[in-house]
Amino acid sequence: MPRPIQPLPRWADPDVPAGSLDPQGLSRRGLLRSAGLFGATFAGGAAFAGGALLAPTPAEAHTPASGDPNLVYLVGDHHVHSVYSHDAKYTFSQLAGAASRYGLDWMVFTEHSNIGHARAGGAEAEHREILKARADNKRMLIFQGLEWYIPGAEHCTVFSPPGRHEAELLTRFEQAYDGKLLGYTAGGPDHPDTPRNEAHAVKALQWLDQQRRCGYVDDVLVLANHPLRLGIDSPHEMRAWRDAAPGIMIGMEGAPGAQAGAFPGWAGPNSIRGEYVNKPSENSWPGYPAAAYVTYGGFDWATATVGGLWDAMLAEGRLFSITTNSDVHRVAYDTWKNGDWLPGQNFDNIGRLPDPVNTAEPQPGGDFWPGQFSRTHVGVTRYGYRDVMAGLRAGRVWVDHGQLIDGIDVRVNREHGIGRGVTLGGRLRVRRGEKIVLNVTVTTASRHNHHGEVPRLAHLDVIRGAVHGPVADRDEWRAPDTRVVHTADVEGRAGRYTLRIPVGKAEESFYLRLRGSDGKRNGPGFLGAAIDPHGPIPHEPGNGDPWLDTWCYTNPVFVDVVH
């Protein structure tokens, strides 16, 4: 007999009257209804019990949805820090409360690996607080994760669903494979330790894959965080991580957190959105241009550059997803400060910071609360921890800043194909010469965002890239056959509308992805106007109000031409 395990979010719960929902909740319930999933269907096909969904059987939990599913997109953040990170500030209750207030359905606490976290009981104490946070926030999916220091490279989110070994997995992984704890930090091309460190990162991902395969944990996922911030995640490393565990290492942050870090007059004259204020170092990969070290419309250069690193990986015909998150440590203009240590205490010997205390003065910080500005939307057919992870693995993901739109549904199909077609992360198999059509349904913002404005989408770009298979040069970061092929001017359009865009005949395998913005700041892309005529551009240092430059991106849909 299945048992109730997870109450639904208020906007999805039929027991919650529509009149009690805020505008965001009403909009999301409308999207749920339009997908035909409002009610028992969204709860895994079982009955409700007081607003709680009933646990699917193990077989149901592993059964993938069809290639043409009705999807609802859950809003989340996989990069959140609490007092269990040495450089953060907030308690679990503060962060979960903010996430609920700003409309998140799921979140991952990702504490930094650290001596105190790994060896002074921080991880175990953190797990007890995770359990309490779940009990106090029953309508939210709260994962325990880790921000892994990749040997010889940057950071990654690592997380698994609730289970008997969720905390133990992270502790074992941290102690055996963390680059910071092991001293495996060198990554420069000429450093003698670099080959060992890069190999250890691959072994780490393979170990996680094995824990999933043997059933030690039900699932585990890894995503690279702020990949170009320091220029130390080389293209060959990112490909090696992907190939080491394709179902585990699934993507990267397309846009970093710290998006509030460059408000004019706040963080200093050299500040950049995302805190991308670095220069190449001895550990940086020398093939990246200087322009790679700043953000573009808040997005990492690897994602924002049409024909750049993300496209070069997609052009191999392999899915590699993007996300966007808060990376919250210290919220801009917030008045809380770190509490004082008791005599003899420090992070290394107790594994956490003192609880913060409120003041009357704004404290330093460059972040937003989870869900306040950055959102990762994951397509699911029902509500649950493993469903979110399955949606991420399948690539059913789109991201936005500033609540730019309420929803987007992307379908690629033959011109006269049956059904609605393949959606984000999926693959459409066609014969050479078949005509392809792209259908995009946009639901515009129906309410004020968290800056007090109703966002307006100005344009939607279709980006197309040829698929050529594996690259000969594992450090190749260009995809020369990728470019913007269509721009839809949607200025002034409101409500829900569908764009039907003919793509032409499929002569070779390719992929499509979408990008849109509020239209306030754009210019020729990094690789030229012929490839990207109006892409995101960097802001002047110290003058990066994020609410005045908001974008949305989707994951790709692949079209595989068979002969």
At which residue positions do the language-model features occur?
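A solvent-exposed, charged loop/short amphipathic helix patch at secondary-structure junctions
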Residues: 173-191, 265-295
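Substrate-binding cleft/loops of secretory-pathway carbohydrate-active enzymes
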Residues: 158-160, 229-249, 330-349
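Sec-dependent signal peptide hydrophobic core
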Residues: 35-43
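Boundary at the C-terminal end of the N-terminal hydrophobic targeting segment
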Residues: 49, 59-61
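A metal-dependent hydrolase metal-coordination microenvironment
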Residues: 62-239, 303-305, 325-328, 523-525, ...
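C-terminal functional module detector
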Residues: 5-19, 62-73, 85, 92-95, ...
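N-terminal secretory signal peptides
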Residues: 1-30, 44-46, 52-54
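Acidic, His- and aromatic-enriched active-site or binding-groove loops in soluble protein domains
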Residues: 164-175, 241-259, 343-362, 377-381
